[in-house]
Amino acid sequence: MRRTIQTALLSLDWLIEKGVRIQADARWQENSAKPCDTGSSVDDLKAEFAKVDFSAVDPVYPDKTSPRGAKYAFTKEAILERARSGVQDIREHKEKLILVVSHSGFLRLGVTGHWFFNGDYRVFELDECNEPDQPPKLKQLEATLSGGLGKSWPDPVVIGSDLPIPDAPPRGKRHSQDTTSFTSDNRLF
């Protein structure tokens, strides 16, 4: 979370000066449980970043490995669920524009299916979904197909690909009943 807060404070300072608040949210953290992808304690972050609102951060953060932290585990199911939850939460906000500063791996494999170069951005609109309990589809603006800086790979990946499935057979040995939770139009479900 520290890296994303630093990025937000540096790149969005002009909005912060106008009173836009920064809201920390544990759902948008990076995927793995490696030290480089596991956050610092909220108390440490509060002391370092007084301008950030941490009131909604899940108290279990930064735990990703205990039973309490299972919803943040480095598994396909956990990552896709927090992506769905995060996108659904955005849909429920009253603001017309929400900026998410997150991590490339999580955004690519859990949320958008698109690559992000360091410091790059993409712009998406939420298309309403008429199916109950389904999050909206993400529709990327054509101007950011290679990232807003033009440095990101334009070729999408399948959401959820390369994410670990506990107790799954090794790649190439999956049975036909093993399926994934995505559609070709990158709708999260």
Regions found by a protein language model. Give the residues of each.
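Active-site rim elements
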Residues: 29-33, 68-76, 111-112
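Generic beta-sheet signal
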Residues: 96-102
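Residues at the C-termini of beta-strands that transition into short coil/loop
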Residues: 26-28, 58, 125-128
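Glycine-rich phosphate-binding loop signature in dinucleotide/nucleotide-binding domains
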Residues: 90-96
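Phosphate-coordination/substrate-recognition cap region in phosphate-metabolizing enzymes
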Residues: 1-55, 114
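Short glycine/proline- and acidic residue-enriched helix-loop micro-motifs
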Residues: 53-74
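Acidic, low-complexity terminal tails and accessory targeting/binding regions
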Residues: 32-51, 93, 108-189
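Loop-to-helix element that buttresses phosphate recognition and phosphoryl-transfer chemistry
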Residues: 1-13, 73-83, 127
